[in-house]
Amino acid sequence: MEEYQKKIKEKLNVVPLEPGCYLMKDRNDQVIYVGKAKRLRNRLRSYFTGAHDAKTTRLVGEIRNFEFIVTSSETESLLLELNLIKQYQPRYNILLKDDKSYPFIKITKEKHPRLLVTRTVKKNSGKYFGPYPNAYSAQETKKLLDRIYPFRKCDNMPDKLCLYYHIGQCMGPCVYDVDLEKYAQMTKEITDFLNGEDKTILHHLEDRMNKASEQLDFEQAKEYRDMIQHIHNLTKKQKIMSSDNTIRDVFGYSVSKGWMCVQVFFVRQGNMIKRDATMIPLQQTEEEEFYTFIGQFYSLNQHLLPKEVHVPKNLDKDIIQSVVDTKIVQPVRGAKKDMINLANHNAEVQLDNKFELIARDESRTIKAIEELGERMGIQTPIRIEAFDNSNIQGVDPVSAMVTFVDGKPHKKDYRKYKIKTVEGPDDYKSMREVVRRRYTRVLNEGLPLPDLIIVDGGKGHMNGVMDVLENELGLDIPVAGLQKNDKHQTSELLYGASAEIVPLKKNSQAFYLLHRIQDEVHRFAITFHRQTRQKTGLKSVLDDIDGIGTKRKTSLLRTFGSIKKMKEASFDELRQAGLPEKVAKNLQNALQNK
């Protein structure tokens, strides 16, 4: 299993069973798909288990990470999904890139307005509500409104009254004069209803239901009762969409175990188009930490100031106003307060995820070192020190040591070594020198000894290290070797005087830990070697000799192993190394004068 797959698997375990949106990312951290879910954990897990169609299989093959945002309802998830798709334009959201894919309810801007379901949004042509998740949902809502509010139904004004007038769903403007204030009142009530304020419409329906019951028209009463139930199911407040176009940023935060998470929702044209999440180690009170953060948010991070900044009520508005030069709002009720609550909740979820992942990681690493000790037949190796050499044909040879404590990198104990006593590319002698230097100093300074030493190499490296430890320094520390396969991947762990293979499953936590250790020490050694080469620029006596360029210099070092060996070589041996007569003479003269 690849490392990114393991990380995804760990993250899936801490995703909440709540509605929300998720963002799938590729190896370049680009959002390639945005989706919504009633239960985030179940939906996200479904991508990584079982069979899929061809398109989903391609998508899953590109996923390297994911993020999620918790919402309060499925409706909010839909609205947020649309906003995120608009922002990121993910290539796997082909059907969702345009709002035309989703239906809206529209009250037309006409003398005698109509109530329509449309997939096309045109500016200044009416009032729009939505989008709705599908046409059925929009049509059912319109059908409900048609039975309560008698807007005009015909596209063109007819010459006589139609059926809708006779069933009470039109006021008959084709024949009768209609009070335009009545239209304005109906538009207001529909606007309130579709924005979550359903008390007025429910009051109308309950009156009609009661009257129908009094008149023993139970069928009609049942119809009104069903309409009331439909409204209860439909009208979930849509906190992700605002009823105005004010540009605002909404802040929420949560604090736990010495950390603060601040969530910022960016609301533009009524839509939450983006969110920012920042983790901060607490150095002061949570209020003081927030004031510092929000002041830096608009100055150091260069975020544009919105028309309004919404913050939780417990904060000091005057202090925030002193560092943020815009209108500060602290909502106490309604949709705006709900948005603050949602930001707080997302911050809380993110903190919980952080600590859950840390706990899982700690549990995993402790199990890994326990398993490693058990398989090797030694005490649990709490402290592990690993060594690796790096050089190019013996030029600028270096070595590096990394330390893992409780299965995690302990970077303050990392060490770098320049090889001092070995000439040429001799891995065994280089390893002996570095181990000798390291543990001589450990003994002299009373530093902690490791429970296990790991060398990047096989039996020869192990024997050299054990000889130095036991016969020169009098130390008894377990020594293991890590070998790689032909693909340069961690292959097997060797241990004991005969360097026997330790039986470890490739998918075990212990093997994964060894893989991390080998990768880390190799990275550290390679980085140090690169830095050393950059400083010296591979500078040597060879650089000043006519006729010897980079290729010949590399070839000579490969053939002789060191400058010292070249100096000891005869003229004929230099010629046999492929040098022209004149260049061989130049080299011999230069080395003899060195």
Swiss-Prot record:
GO molecular function: DNA binding; excinuclease ABC activity
Keywords attached to this entry: Cytoplasm, DNA damage, DNA excision, DNA repair, Excision nuclease, SOS response
Keyword DNA repair: yes
Limits of the UVR domain: 199-234
InterPro entries documented for this protein: GIY-YIG_endonuc, GIY-YIG_endonuc_sf, GIY-YIG_UvrC_Cho, RuvA_2-like, UVR_dom, UVR_dom_sf, UvrABC_protein_C, UvrC
GO biological process: nucleotide-excision repair; SOS response
The GIY-YIG domain, residue ranges: 17-94
Primary localisation category: cytoplasm
Subcellular location: Cytoplasm
GO cellular component: cytoplasm; excinuclease repair complex
Function: The UvrABC repair system catalyzes the recognition and processing of DNA lesions. UvrC both incises the 5' and 3' sides of the lesion. The N-terminal half is responsible for the 3' incision and the C-terminal half is responsible for the 5' incision.
PANTHER family reported for this sequence: UVRABC SYSTEM PROTEIN C, UVRC/OXIDOREDUCTASE
Subunit organization: Interacts with UvrB in an incision complex.
UniProt family annotation: Belongs to the UvrC family.
Record protein name field: UvrABC system protein C
Natural source organism: Staphylococcus epidermidis (strain ATCC 12228 / FDA PCI 1200)
